[in-house]
Amino acid sequence: MSEHLLSVEDLKTYFFTSRGVVHAVDGVDFYVDEDEAVGIVGESGCGKSMTAFSVIGLVPSPPGRIVGGKIFYLGNDLTKIPDDKMRKIRGKEIAMIFQDPMTYLNPVLRIKHQLGEAITLHQGKKNIDVAVQSALELVRIPSPRRVANGYPYELSGGMRQRVLIALALLLHPRLVIADEPTTALDVTVQAQILELLKQIRLEVKTSLVLISHDLGLIAEACDRVYVMYAGVMVEHAEVIDLYENPKHPYTTGLLKSALSIDEFKEDLSIIHGSVPNLMNPPSGCRFHPRCPECMPICIEKLPPRINLGSDDKPHEVSCWLFKG
């Protein structure tokens, strides 16, 4: 039985298409403790969002399905429970903030109706208006009663994102997964949403998994971070340790490619190439076609995960440059 709030072990989520099998998530391990913020960072197409969908049981099926691994929540394997029990956990115990509010908010239904559906599903119809207004107040929406009676198209992008956050927090879940919650917003609003998430997490004492390609966002909001590439985790450490002392060449490349006002005179570093086709992933280390440190063994064998830190302060890396 897991000692963590959430523990994902060797998770594999594949998509079976007419052209072949897509290894979207291919042996992922990570954990989240109570009252902790954990980041998952990587380029688009690395499997971050599909990892989140796997955890909350929303993998599009067909063509996708979880083909291996375990997802322990409070010691119970979510991959083995029936759909009706998973629906009771989703939203009430584990909630998700999606990245595009206009995709996940119905434009022709009032805000209070959309938030009220979640309450009705888990708690019945009692005190819906009070609960909706309280949730909107929690995310600092001005005039919450007016907003509750309005429609999504009447709100700005930042306000719509606040509504999605309110929807996720409506039933006071123990774990919230935020999937690129600031992607569609301008920089000023991004900062406001990030600060809001940090404040609310402390107020309601919930754990957070923050998925992003933005290294600055992860550094600002998280305690630990996992680096994901081509369906696998390649590095894991406390945020400060990873940013100050990256081990995997992919992590190093991500950090060097991030813009910094302190280094505006230098040429911007890039990672050459692109994320591989997960229908036919590279042999050995999946980063080897793009890696400046590539050795023959990197092409031949998948590197094991090695802890270069301690049990209390792990710094795990999967790279043949490190042999323990």
What are these regions (language model features)?
Residues 4, 142-148, 236-324:
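Short catalytic/signature loops enriched in Gly
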Residues 77, 127-146, 198, 255-256:
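Conserved ABC ATPase "signature" region
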Residues 170-174:
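A short, proline-enriched helix->beta-strand linker immediately N-terminal to the Walker B motif
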Residues 43, 177, 181, 185-266:
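P-loop NTP-binding/switch modules centered on Walker-like glycine-rich loops
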Residues 150-155, 159:
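Conserved ABC ATPase signature
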Residues 66-77:
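Conserved ABC transporter NBD signature motif
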